Each structure stands twice: as structure tokens, then as C-alpha cells.
Amino acid sequence: MTTRFDLDGGAVGFVESSSAVPLVSLVVSVRSGALADPEGKDGVCRFAARMLRRGADGMTAQEIEATIDRLGAELALDVGPSTVSLHGQVIRRNVEPFVELITRLLGKPAFADEEIARLRRETAAELVESRDSDRALANLAFRRALFAGHPYSRSAAGRPSTIAGIERDDVVAAYEKHFVRGDVVIGFAGAITEDEAKRHGDSLAAAVREGERVATRPPEPEKKEGRRLVFVDKPERTQTQTLIGSLGTWPHDDDHFPLVTATAVLGGTFTSRMMREIRSKRGWSYGTSARLSIERRRHAFTMSAAPGAADCAPCVELELALLEDFVGKGITKRELGFIKNYLVRSYAFEVDTAPKRLGQAVETELLELPADYHTRYVDHVRAVTLETANAAAATRLSAKDVVIIVVGTAADTLEAVQKKIPDLASTDVVPFDAD
């Protein structure tokens, strides 16, 4: 069982001890992320976090990387709208020096001008390279369209234009804003005791300065009416990417788990409605799914597919028809019985390792989820009835008020797609390489 404990200065710690393997996983997170980037400085939070391992406390970037390798460790970074997390793993005998290294990275980053210039160039190149991924383009366009005017529309990675304007003062300001002790959440999993975790947690928390906590609780996103098509125009696309969606769920909704369960019927398994109709019957897309994302505020419901260019228009038409049927008629008793059994049984794979169990506890803390969100997941699913599942789909979702994203070649595909969308309210064509 994951144990929660308080650390100095308002930081919070977790430990999930296990002797299964001689490894220790750790995570150091803060309760703020890209939502707090200043206007015109999109990407600066992630930029500052990446700079932590590019020089600290007299160590160069090369020396830091060599130390990580020598310890047999791994260290990765994840930056989202509301959180920043450093994830590490190391063999047990090297926990002490690994924690010492991370303490130095957190507490005394150098932010050398030459490293900032190098990372600025690398980030700009990565953003350009990301345009090679049609899926990434679809996700970016969807987020910007669905959450237009809301902080959730912004990309943690930033834009080429904003990255170009990031200077050292911006990086230092972002570091000082986000890395404050009262916002720190630290977790350990694996071959480590509770006493050891508390001792190492105190060392890590002490490395971070005390300061004013960041308020990253954005307003509730606004629902936008009508079917709105955004076509991301990219040359020579023989395959397309589609995303159809709207606002979805919030973990504190009374009907959250009924909607999660119903959505799994629509597109959450290999035998879901979408897989059966789009892949198995018609062969239009190898993969297709529906999902709900969670955040501190209501986030997105999405349906995705990747049909060939010739099949894109009928595939979009079918997805909209499936959504209309799902919202209007709901799911069947047989479908509900199957999906509840599937979700309950497969949950074992969500908690079969100490790092996974730790991850659930940390996520609950960071995203302010209900305290029993993960610990009583199975009970929540079992409590879903046909009435609550269908009411949730009908209440929370709409087939009439959706964003429709297509990444393809407009000259070949746009007109056909438009003809297959009844009651289309608007169309925007966006160049794939737009900032």
C-alpha cells in the first residue's frame, strides 16, 4: 500500500515499498505546468525544466549525463498543463548518489547562456520535426480548436516563434515560479523503506526554495456550438488522420465513471463499436478508438482514426453516425456487462508493479482527483448501471457540437469531407507548418 507523508516546507512524499526487484523508482513533481507560461512565452516552463540537467552546481551537461550512466540510472522529464515531473530509476545500491545528483540539479541549476542557446536551437528543430507526425499535427489542431481562448489550448512545447524569444531571464523566472517547496510532490517505489524514503525526500525538498505557490486552476472550458471542421493541409498525404471530439468529463462529476465505462464500449477495446465498424467491417483504419482525458478541469472526449485519403470522407461520416447513435440511443445491457467485466479484470495490470501503484497516488495528489479515484476504481466501475451510463453519454456529449480535425491534402480530400458532414457550421484550412 502506498504511504503518504509530509515533508518540510509543505512538500508531500509517497512511498510504495516492494522487494520484487532491486530497483528504486522515484518521481519529483511540482503542481504547476505549462498553463502558467506567460503570454508570448509558450514553452518556457518545459524549457526551464529541460535546462535542469544541462549544468548544475559546477557540473557540465556532459558530466551530468556521464554520472547518470555510471550509476546505471535513468532520468526523464514530463511537462503537462498542470504538472512538471522528473522520473528516475536506479539500482538500489546507487540510490544515495542518484538522489544527491537530483538534489544538485533541482537546487543549483546553472542556466548557462551557451546551453540556453543550444537548447533553443534544439527545441526549434524538434518543433519543426514534429510536423512530420500527422498524429501530432491532429492533436495540436484539436487542442487549439476545442479550447480556443482557454489555457488548455496552449502547447507545453511552445511554438517556434515563442521559443525564439526565450532568454535567460525568462528561464530563471520560470524556474523560480514553478520550483517552490510547497508545490513539490516526491515519490519512491521499489526496494526502499519508508524511513529511507522520508530521509531522501527531505533532502530533495530542501533543495527547492520556499516561495509563493503557483495558482494553476484554470476556468471551466466553454462549450462551443456547431460542427466545426479544421483541415490541416499537408502535401501528398495518401493517409489521413482524423480526430472528432468535444468537452468530456471531470473526475469529480457524479457521472464520471458511467461516462468512462460507456466510452470504452464506443472505442476502448479491440471489440469496440468503432473497431468493429471502421476496422473489421470496412478496413478503413488499422487503429481507431475513443477516449476521455482528465485534468484539473473538464477536458476532452476524442474519437480517432487514420483512414486512407480515399476513405477519409466516408470514415468521418461513419464516426459522426456512431457518435449520434451512442449519444442518442446509448449502449446495450450486453455491452455494459462485457465492458464492466473487461475493465474490472484488466485493472490488475494497472497495479501490478510498485511504480504503477506509486504513479496512481502521485497522480491523485497532483491532479486533485477524488481520494478514492484509483483505490476504489473497481468499485466505481461495478456501480455503473445501464441507466447511469446512457444518461452520462446523453448529458455530457453531443454529436452536434463537435470539433472535426482532418490532416490531409486539402486539394484531394477537403471537398469530399465537407459533403459528408451534415450541418457543418464552419471550415478552417490551416497550413501544416503554421506557427
Predicted regions and their residues:
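N- or domain-start disorder-to-order transition segments that initiate the globular core
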Residues: 1-24
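Buried hydrophobic packing residues in well-ordered domains
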Residues: 10, 28, 46-48, 68, ...
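M16/MPP (pitrilysin/insulinase) zinc-metallopeptidase core fold and M16-derived inactive scaffolds
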Residues: 25-92, 132, 155, 268-284, ...
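M16/insulysin-pitrilysin zinc metalloprotease superfamily fold
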Residues: 54-58, 88-122, 269, 289, ...
